[in-house]
Amino acid sequence: MFHLLLENEEIQFSNSFAQFYLQVDEAKKIFDEIDDDEYDKIQDQRKNDDFIVDDDGYGYRDHGGEIWERDDHPEDGGKKKKKSSMYVFSFSPKFIAQPLFLQPNEQSITAFMKPKSTINRPGAVTNSSAQIKQKPKVSAEQSKDIMNNLFQELDSKDVDELQDVNNSAVVTELNKPIAFNQNDMLTSKYAVTLETRQEVEQKRVTEQIQAQAQIGQNQQSSNPFSKKRKFEEISTNQNANASDSKRVSNQTNDNLNKVETQVISMLKVANPQIKVTSKLARMDDSMKIDQTSAQKNQIEQTVNHSKLQRYNQNQMMSGIKLDNRTSKPIRNLEIWNQVLANTQEFPLPLNENGTLSFYWIDAHEENNGTDLYIFGKIYQPQMRQFVSCSMKVNGMQRELYALPKMRGKARGALTVEEEKQQVRAVMMELDDIRKKRFPQISKWRCKPVNRKYAFEMPIQHGEHQFLKIKYDSTMPPLPSTIQGNTFECIFGSTQSMLELFILKRKIRGPCWMTIKNPTKVTDFKKTWCRQGIVIDNPKNVEVTLEDLNKQELPPLTSLTFSFKTTRAQQNTNEIAMISCLINTNIAQEGPSQVERTQSFTLLRKLDGKPMPYDFDQKVKQRKENIIQKFENERQMIEAFIAKVFIVDPDLVVAHNLCGGMFDLLLARIQYLKVNHWSRIGRLKKTQIPNKKLDFGGSSYGGSQWIPRQVTCGRLLVDTFLSAKELVRETSYDLTYLAKVQLKKDRQDFDDELLPTLYITSERLFSLIDHTEKDAYLTIQLMNHLAIIPLTLQLTNIAGNLWFRSLQNARAERNEMLLLHEFKKKKFILPDKKAPFAKDFKRNMFADEFEELKSGKGPKKGGKRKKAAYAGGLVIEPKAGFYDNIILLLDFNSLYPSIIQEYNLCFTTVNRRPTKNFDGSEVKSQFKAAGTDANEGNEVEEADLPDKNVNVKDAVLPNVLRDLVQKRKAVKEKMKNEKDAVKLSQLEIRQKAIKLTANSMYGCLGFGSSRFHAQAIAALITKTGRDTLLRTKDIAENKLGFNVVYGDTDSIMINTGTNQLQQSLEMGKRPQGLKLIALYKCLEIEIDGVFKSLLLLKKKKYAALKYEGFGTPDAKVVQEVKGLDMVRRDWCPLSKNVGNFVLNQILSGKQREDVVLNLNEYLSDIGEKMKNNGITLDQFIITKQLTKAISEYSDIKGQPHVAVAQRLKNQGKSESDLVNNFIPYVIGAQPFDPSKTNPALAGKAYHPEEVVSSKGKILLDIEWYITMQVLPPITRLIEHIDGIDVEFVAQCLGVDPKKYKYHSSEKKTGETNNDDGTLIQNPILQTETERSLKGRTIAELTIKCPHCSESYHFPGIFQDGKNNTLSGLLCIKCTQPIPEAYIQNRVTLFLKQLLTLYYQGNKQCQEPACGAVSRQLLYNNKCINLACKLKNDTRYTEQKTNDTLRYLQGLFNVKKYIQENQKNGCVHKTVEEVPNFDAFARMQGKVDDIMIRSKYNKVDLSSIFNFMKLGKQQ
């Protein structure tokens, strides 16, 4: 028998040799076939060869063995493999020299590193070559004894165990279901129930007994490796002839290559740290063939079984079918490249009059406006298709306007001669400044013009005279802060040439243009477009309005791609795979056929590791897409860029493209120094931009974003950003959007698991399919949301750049729309202020702009900036569960309607200037002392303009009015349109108009907008609040509705009925005369119908909503707003229980049935939790490690950090932990046994620690119940009668007494009538008083001195016969209670009340926690580090005041009389009330405290103090 030892460093050599061997012709001899005697002679010759000169027999020697014989590493089980002395073949007579300098009586280092069984005995001489020569040969009998001993050692394990050395780890990995994300991996790995220590110990004893019973029952007769098979039984096979040896050798190597190499390579790819040692015994022909075939069959069966198991368990993309895609490529990319390369030789397709029809898509300026490029498409008749074309515009000129400085007279009061002299003085001063300070500006032209102004600088609104200056754009612009003696400031110095070009040529979005006198570019092209032209004058560009406007818009080419990334050893993200879909027929005005796509996938090896052995073969069998494999990342990215250039897409589409994908691609391009990287865009560049902002130029829309600089000429479509603008969802990741919008399932993917998917071809193909389907879902989402046609319509309305509409730059859209309108009316336009790096972030415009809808300020430094003015009104909700229909009435575009209703515009609202001439902010004289400069400004309240004012110059209302009329016209067309395609186009257009109109208000309050007018924005929101309050008053007092909630522009009313049609009729009543008589432009209508509603707090509710109400196809769906049920710091069990409780509450069942179902379900959950009936994965909590472990100041209160610290101590790299989610569970025992009261972090464990502890670590079930299960349930049942926290706690099996306090707080002053039937109609009967009593800190309790009955003091009350009774009588024994005792109780009650208030205790919002403290922590965090919620003031000013008012109500006899008169009860005078004097004296005590309180007082002198100061001035 011969052993071939394959160590880690030799596996690649073996694999490469096997490939080399397969390529050699069989006629050539690779091996020398010799017998044992000849081989022994060769070994002796090697040992005798003294190949180191003059070393005196020391140091270097050759043992005569082969390279694969070194067995310095232990095998599995800690045993060393014995060296065989018999060999069959040799690669080549290479010498393996081992350096060692030996001192006398010392052994060699080789002997030191060898196993003990192979080290020479102390008596043996090892350093003399002469003695090595005299080594005696081993006899045949001794060889037999040695081989028998070897077999006995090898057969100590069964054959299956020997095979496990090679493939057990692989089979274990393959049998696992494919997990694309960490949650799936945790679920599949830890879906096991935990065992107690006793169960583990009992199981261990049982296994030992069974193991002992199986000793001696091995199937040795059928085992070819049985230890009973002696050396004699196989000795005859060793004397086989040369042909037999050759046949055995070939079969052995073939099996080795096919089986062992596959297993070992997969192991190394799965885990590079696995130490693989393969062992193959050379046997006779039949035995060897049987063994290897059996091993191979076993592996194949195991793998096939695992594949079947995997595909059954893992439906990763159910519902997605790519069958409609063309199986054949649309075009061969190489042929396509050759054809398109010839387009440069084609002439320009000029019209008969010599003009060129050019459809423009994008534009870009370089070098501070010197170079202006327009990108678009032209029709190439030779190719019968549209090709890309670039146009460079020369001859642009800057336009500046200088405002003359007034001296002595007001503007408009000068004579014509004085105006001429004033303008001449400005001209001379500016020309002098040009010559001295700006010699680069060689010449310019000037002339006086009349322009209007209506913005925020201290310039009187109206028409004034300006000096207009024009000069070539190749000269530098003047600074915006320049001022002189004769002029105040200069407008237009920061305006980009692209913006000026769009405004001057009146270009509103992508359209056909007629180009006059175009010149084709043949040499030194600056772009990657197929064609290029140059024009010398911007006036040669005209928007086509008539003939060509009827021409259909050219189709666009899109390239949709998706990445898979991996983490490199240097802790950097690398791209491992790119899948792309190509579509050459994207429609601009309607839906596109996304099924006709060509796909290709590029992938590379991971860190040089081999691919699966059969991957190339299976790639050839796949015909539906193109898969290309590369050796490294650079080759793959270069191929990707090359294909982008060949395809030349107009649209580059991806999900979350702007959120990191493109940044990663550019980072890898820069790091790997990829060639021709600028082909990603259409403008040739040599240096990769490395700054987020381009401060060097006045680029369009301010500074530029890096991906924009790289991809100019192509449009970036990020479905993540577009979805945020077009749909309102709780999440915008691809998985959620695919499920909600496309009704298709997708599995999340974690990059950490990517190496495990490179093990086999099946797994790798599943990863390829996942990546390709991500791209397919992305383009489907783009088509489903109509992103292309919708953003095109938005761009055509606003007149901005298309790429900015795709980036959700709503503020910029509004800017451009207003710029077009004000430019048309000859207004001086406000300058664009340069943004700062800290303000320029991805989606900056969208984020800040969105916040202005609710009156919130933009984010600053990661925190919300305090609102400079009040936002929308939120009516206090009447929290509770409503099981009848709730109507949601909503104003149609409230803020735009207010602008039209009151004619609000820059030109009509009188306000103070907010900017100086140098652009700095004017310090507000209304700002309170000590107020921060950036926060808390008191905005001047402007007055509504007179409605009778001329509205011709009111630009903003006219723009909105025009948009509303256009939308109405489109809706009218939709009613009569029967063509589905045209109907879809009209729907997209009316939606675009609506989005534009609704966002116009935002530019007024957006601080970075050029049209920022805070006073107008504050006036609009104030009017909106007044409108909502007036609507609520009409609904309640005139229409008799019960308004339960209101927010900004909508109210919820309780219809009190369960009939849908009846509730809809009620919803039409507010649309009647009541509101129409008040407003002309404001309209209110039904926006939603809720079958049932669980209203908890502001902006937090859950409901069953009628979808498509008013139609026969109406259905009920569940809608949840603001209820955070998917936080990662809740374990899956908590989420499941919370969802079940919510579904039961909204189910519509009877209250008794709901309580019964909850009791049964929660009791079952509690029982399973205590009896280990729930799998471990349901208890796992995950939380992200956002920074390095050392940066966390306190680890005790952060369990995930403590677990990460232990993982790091166990050898896991910190780079693999940071920014990843750490899973953990909470155990019942502390991690450090020396701690008696450990923090939560001391009880946190990684799930693997729990599984490997064998029952030593148990979960803290009580903690999970109190901190994970109870809190979400408590918030849901807080306002539901019949269900309280005590009930839930009892169901879950915990002590309900702990939650008695929270349950009592929930009750709203219910009175116990079991013993006293006298309390029938207490005085606190109105809804206000009942809510007041429920908001009190405590109620006045007294104890009867006669019968010792304790009860809440009722004050003045009536019996059932309307007889007024005094509260000074005991409700049980009816004995009088002394007045002095009542007064003493009132005094003590007031003292305790004020003491509680001034203590200022803070209490945690979490009922299960309830921690109370007087400490003030950052951000009001709970003092309990294990808790996640915040503290609230326990006894607030409002509660204290409500309690005092409650006491007043107990003793206020006059109010009692008034209430009785309202209710039609018996009229009594004050004197007729029993114990009137006593009640008056006790009320006086309360009144004294109320008078000293300033909570319910308004200091008018401080409010109107500014008027007093104004008079003094």
Swiss-Prot record:
NCBIfam families: pol2. The keyword Membrane does not apply. Its EC number is 2.7.7.7. GO terms for molecular function: chromatin binding; DNA replication origin binding; DNA-directed DNA polymerase activity; nucleotide binding; single-stranded DNA binding; zinc ion binding. Polymerase alpha in a complex with DNA primase is a replicative polymerase. Gene3D superfamilies: 2.40.50.730, 3.30.70.2820, 6.10.10.100, DNA Polymerase alpha, zinc finger, DNA polymerase family B, C-terminal domain, Helix hairpin bin, Palm domain of DNA polymerase, Ribonuclease H-like superfamily/Ribonuclease H. This is DNA polymerase alpha catalytic subunit. InterPro entries: DNA-dir_DNA_pol_B (IPR006172), DNA-dir_DNA_pol_B_CS (IPR017964), DNA-dir_DNA_pol_B_exonuc (IPR006133), DNA-dir_DNA_pol_B_multi_dom (IPR006134), DNA/RNA_pol_sf (IPR043502), DNA_pol_a_cat_su_N (IPR024647), DNA_pol_B_thumb (IPR042087), DNA_pol_palm_dom_sf (IPR023211). A zinc finger (CysA-type) spans 1344-1373. Residues 235-254 are annotated as: Disordered. A motif (CysB motif) lies at residues 1404-1427. CDD domains: DNA_polB_alpha_exo, POLBc_alpha. It comes from Oxytricha trifallax (Sterkiella histriomuscorum). The keyword DNA-binding applies. It is found in: Nucleus. SMART domains: POLBc (SM00486). In eukaryotes there are five DNA polymerases: alpha, beta, gamma, delta, and epsilon which are responsible for different reactions of DNA synthesis. Signal peptide: none annotated. Keywords: DNA replication, DNA-binding, DNA-directed DNA polymerase, Metal-binding, Nucleotidyltransferase, Nucleus, Transferase, Zinc, Zinc-finger. Zn(2+) 2 binds at residues 1404, 1409, 1422, 1427. One of its GO terms (cellular component) is alpha DNA polymerase:primase complex. Zn(2+) 1 binds at residues 1344, 1347, 1370, 1373. GO terms for biological process: lagging strand elongation; leading strand elongation; mitotic DNA replication initiation. Belongs to the DNA polymerase type-B family. It catalyses: DNA(n) + a 2'-deoxyribonucleoside 5'-triphosphate = DNA(n+1) + diphosphate. It comes from the Eukaryota.
